[in-house]
Amino acid sequence: MSIKLIETALSEVLLIEPDVFKDHRGFFLETFQKKNYAELGIDKSFVQDNHSHSSRGTLRGMHYQLKYPQAKLIYVITGEIYDAVVDIRRGSPSFGQWKGFSLSAEKKRQLFV
């Protein structure tokens, strides 16, 4: 396993560069593998998997859950997005800070929030 984990300025917000296996047919990658991610310190049980499509120029709002917070693993399958994360968790070392991340289908990076 050579998944690369990149810490960000925000507490518990991580960039992940997964293993990508390329050949003449295209590529293969595991978007999530519980054991491998647990070894990186991401030991979460994902209970929901969503897929969305945004037309060029779309701005989506911020999402959060107070009563039942959810971890999110974000990646892009076509094109590119700019994802802004704002830390509104009281008691977090990075409370009140924000950071923006560019994610693209080409680079295949993931964002764990």
Feature roles, as predicted:
Residues M1-E106:
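Non-catalytic, conserved peripheral segments adjacent to functional cores
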